């Protein structure tokens, strides 16, 4: 369907359901997050940056003399544009102005308390260089474009787990963790003996009761918190307890006897609710508590002799018969009922454990209070070996979990805690409370006894996304915390002159800048942006990484973390993830997924009520959809929106179930919501194996932009969405008519409530991207065309008419071709080369610096010693290659000489210098040469000169050119502004009536008449000026206002222009020691070559093995030769059948395109009618009749423009999981006059004979990937050697050799090639003397002498010597043996 945003192209869409909501902006997550951090849009709410400042400030002096407070902050404007930052190697950033208040307090000398305020000083402090996000959602750091990837990390909160015990076989260990966003982690765990322990930050574990005591709980309080208290009454030597039916539900462990000793219920039998109620009715109030069970219970409260007040037994005393005999005198006593349902003896066991610890501590510390001792114990575990005071220990425990400066659960953590433990603590309490810790322990005991719910840490309710704003806020917090420490140190150092101190003396903003820049330059999540094509860029910004600070370590990440989880459905793409060690740790957001304010990923669903699908769309997180029954998007629905079948397949909590239609709560928004952006570009994805789909989506990101882009015949409808959200394409901000368009500018004239306006859009040309591909924008609108808001008016690289186009449609055949396509190799026709189908342009940047050295300054010059004049012919007078020069390997790009240390010259040298000029003697050639693989044309040169150094002729020329361009651009914009002003004035006058009779353009107008706008537009500006006087005062005033408005606009434009000129004239900022920097840009055309890697969209990749003359390629009966021959064996085992279906639909598109072209060629009278009929016939295939309606609404001119596009191939959109069916294929085949099996007869191009079998010929979208053979081919003659081993270095970058490894040695051994092997292991490797003498012998034409001892042997002997082993090498002859 032609969406208003889809450029000028019609596609036949096979969607089952019309799209109900637009796909959310693909980059909104990052933009929203950064805007919140810097508070760019919202002016009222608190920004991320302010929150961080408020969490650190105020900072108080320990002696109560001073305090520093944060007042406000203000974000500045960037100094340079994005382009200038990239050229000059600067950071695109803003300055942050922070207002700080320093308060001096009056102090009471005796008490040290504050009495009042002595003085208040306010100062603004600048924090330099806070990187600013560009409008393309990236950052420019030191001239390089980078992206900050979103992090997927464990959400703060509480989590309960069960794991297999590492010590005891077949035993499960239960643990709980309270995870904060910042602060100490708290672990609760059972050991093998069922004691409940707690550990802080993975330190030594302590019994949990020690933690409770350190928090101030008494022994009895703890028992009451965890155990039901059972009161035992002593009557006539019997122990009785009240009969509470709830205590005895389920199985009863002992015979229940009443007061008289009659058995009312036998042991081991289940007591039903009914039976229990019957017993209550029968008047059973007391039951006997058997002595044998009582003897192993513990007292809940101490037993005190009422007469003497002496404590007979403390609480938690284990009862035995002798103790019971003593207790009998008491009428009642309490025991802790650890046999009740849902509790166990863990806490009692912990008490027994901690008793011994505290006994020891009592003796060493001389403190009786057990709560103080517990705090000391925790302090000793956390800080072993440090002396401790009880107050310090208490403060330490308090700081661990209850101090907002040290501990932060965040709003998310608090929400998760409340949800899991059933608390209602307010969400602004982001530290722990005692209740949190107690409830966690209680829940863990419940989990252990099978009554709680174990969490799944890979569930998306327990993982959240930290985007750029939050990551930056965390970094800023780290920087401020460092600064806070430094300020406190300065406070203590202040003794005298406190009155003179200013905020600036205390605050060093550099700490903040350094921390933030460290994050951008060295952080794991800040990455060099993948800019190969628009798709790579969009997916890079949508990436979710589980690595990074506070995340996982890839070496330790297990299988579960990497696996696809049921909650990923509609939130995280199950397909797109890298192959290799990062598999599953780096993911991508699904197409429709959104991230809410708390950082949880949400998926969209439609609500279903009583089996009827409503149009209400809800976004739910993984936690919110727990327990709901969700039907798939493919569920059959009738016209009224009711579900057709009574039972439907649905999902509930990750399980697939069969549910009645009335039970269904939600239905998926659409089938394609499961996968991410890259995977949803693969047509017929549902027919591909997941492994291949993964390769397909990863390889699309590596497709290089080609010379001309061509949209796929078989698309999925996602192509336009990526173009819509990628910054590469230019979109119209306001609707209007194209006024002027050229190669670099588009002007659009429109009208809004203020009258006419003209918008200006500038296009970039031939820029180098991060991956050295070319970035060029070109207009796709014509003068006079109407443009809507958001419509794409200029294509970027890899775009065609506002759609992503990363490859080319090629005619392919699945057939072997003389063995050349063995093992996935690809045979291509020479026609592809001739037509530059797969030719791409790459731009390389080479730079050279002239530095200040101790012997003088390096110089960029043409005057280079010992270089032939011919080799310098292509350099200009400044020594830099001219633009347009063809560069070949070994040519000089920039001439540079470096001063040599002055040695006293000999008389001969002095004479030569006197004759031939001063230069040659004391400089060395340090020029920049083109590398071995570099071939191309110099397209641009940039020269930067340091302040105080003279600019050379080339730099002055470049400056003049740049200035001229700026002047021209300024002039164009002024002209357009004048035009806009005239239009506004004409519009104003045409709406108003004349106040007097006037003659305009020879035509007379009476008073009160209105002049037509077209007539007014013919008058020049100055005549208009006088004409205004013929209108009313109000009109004249409006005219004056308009004039003033445009004068101000022109002033603004002028000041902008002056600012640009000023920046141009400014001295360049260069690193210290660098005097001049020259950057040379070389463009290379890379044609398709043998060895280049190509791929389809289904993970079908291969290397070009042969380029065959067009005449030798197999051809179709109509004489058309195929472009590419692929190996049919690559399909069945890989199970990516999508490519077969794609090529079927592709050939249909081609054939139907030929039929439309035929109508054009014949050009009969009623050809427009024929075109319309044909196009409508083709459109009838679509499932929704939207295209039909659209075509019917077109006028003839529009119809022809769409038909011209279709003549090159009818375009289809087959969305993922809604692909073309068999029935539709047969209909299409019939229409395109293709055999029903999709195969064609083929003829051998070499012999002209018909092939024995019919062959599958189709049209497939092929990509050329950026693994180009030109950049990989490498050979070494002689080159650098490694210092220690004296073996040649490795790698292309170092001009290294190919490693002849262990297995290669085996191969030569197997052949018995002894001499070759000896040569490989000695003179070609690390026999230093041997290679020197071999070179000598070769130059003299003698035989190569015998080899010496390899350096490796000396390395080995020296290593042995370092172990104090004396190793000597004896020669045979020496000892006359």
Curated annotation (Swiss-Prot):
One GO biological process term: DNA-templated transcription
GO molecular function terms listed in the Swiss-Prot or TrEMBL record: DNA binding; DNA-directed RNA polymerase activity; ribonucleoside binding
Catalytic activity, reaction form: RNA(n) + a ribonucleoside 5'-triphosphate = RNA(n+1) + diphosphate
InterPro entries (alphabetical): DNA-dir_RNA_pol_bsu_ext_1_sf (IPR042107), DNA-dir_RNA_pol_bsu_external_1 (IPR019462), DNA-dir_RNA_pol_su2 (IPR015712), DNA-dir_RNAP_su2_dom (IPR007120), DNA-dir_RNAP_su2_hyb_sf (IPR037033), RNA_pol_bsu_bac (IPR010243), RNA_pol_bsu_CS (IPR007121), RNA_pol_bsu_protrusion (IPR007644)
Keyword annotations: DNA-directed RNA polymerase, Nucleotidyltransferase, Transcription, Transferase
Family annotation (Pfam families): RNA_pol_Rpb2_1, RNA_pol_Rpb2_2, RNA_pol_Rpb2_3, RNA_pol_Rpb2_45, RNA_pol_Rpb2_6, RNA_pol_Rpb2_7
Family under the similarity heading: Belongs to the RNA polymerase beta chain family.
Protein function: DNA-dependent RNA polymerase catalyzes the transcription of DNA into RNA using the four ribonucleoside triphosphates as substrates.
Complex formation: The RNAP catalytic core consists of 2 alpha, 1 beta, 1 beta' and 1 omega subunit. When a sigma factor is associated with the core the holoenzyme is formed, which can initiate transcription.
Protein name listed in UniProt: DNA-directed RNA polymerase subunit beta
